UniProtKB/Swiss-Prot annotation:
PANTHER family: DEOXYURIDINE 5'-TRIPHOSPHATE NUCLEOTIDOHYDROLASE. Its EC number is 3.6.1.23. Pfam families: dUTPase (PF00692). Coiled coil: none annotated. Keywords: Hydrolase, Magnesium, Metal-binding, Nucleotide metabolism. This enzyme is involved in nucleotide metabolism: it produces dUMP, the immediate precursor of thymidine nucleotides and it decreases the intracellular concentration of dUTP so that uracil cannot be incorporated into DNA. The lineage of its organism: Bacteria, Pseudomonadati, Pseudomonadota, Alphaproteobacteria, Maricaulales. This is Deoxyuridine 5'-triphosphate nucleotidohydrolase. Belongs to the dUTPase family. It catalyses: dUTP + H2O = dUMP + diphosphate + H(+). It comes from Maricaulis maris (strain MCS10). The keyword ATP-binding does not apply. Transmembrane segments: none annotated.
Amino acid sequence: MSTVPVKIKPLDHYEGLALPAYETPQSAGMDLRAAVPADEPVSIPPGEWRLIPVGIAIALPAGFEAQVRPRSGLAAKHGISCVNTPGTVDADYRGEIRVNLINHGQANFVVNRGDRIAQMIIAPVTQAVWEIADTLDETTRGTGGFGSTGTK
């Protein structure tokens, strides 16, 4: 496992919250906390989504991205996920990170200040250099997609 230094800027509305942290020594992701006002929890009715601020901005080194992903416990227990998963935070983005949560569950879900709402993974980036081709290598799969390899 490797590490990379990442600058983090807690924003004014992040005051009093713990910085994102790895919960175990082998964790790939660190939890992001909701930076909503304590007196204004955010309600997410079934089938709807809300953009939740996390109160931090980061400066990733060139060649890295941050991926924002759902927390498995919220998905399993409440049907809460991220609308665009994984969400990508590019190395040159300097604004506040926000999480677009969606409620796939049957009950209203309330996000309170400090709730752990998503996880963030720091990952290396590989950029493609396109090579125009008239043909592509043949494979066993060919053009089969969307279930073409079966379900069992």
